[in-house]
């Protein structure tokens, strides 16, 4: 009986140790420079006071990290000049288009936008709103936390800790994380970007 209990205890310890490894958060952004990221398009990217900043028009910055089943989280803020619209997105399981027809990543986008019908919390695929958010919880010039989880075909978004979107889709299997600069006159800022694999 004692031997069985010892073996059971060892099995539990090994199980929890494995889960601990699977749940380790990994930083996507070092807060100092663009190391670990690749720029595509016209948008200009820089680091200011520990914040990743994108301005100047359409373009995307891709993280080197590749994700399949994962959780990701980060703090985001968008703003725009008078007369312009603020629009951005946090992409996942995405890759640059091979033919660069429109420059948009091929993958999933967690929308960041406060002034259109498909606002922050919506799921987009290239040019198409796909999963609808339950409510708008973000504003221009205010930081908010995005938390994304995708395992297999199941996608979930949380904003500031509140679940706002669930959807199932199987088109894109694996790819990078990316952030979008959408149009002139707007600015996207991001910090505290992390992800972890889910096994």
Model-derived features: positions:
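Bacterial N-terminal signal peptides that target proteins for export
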Residues: 1-7
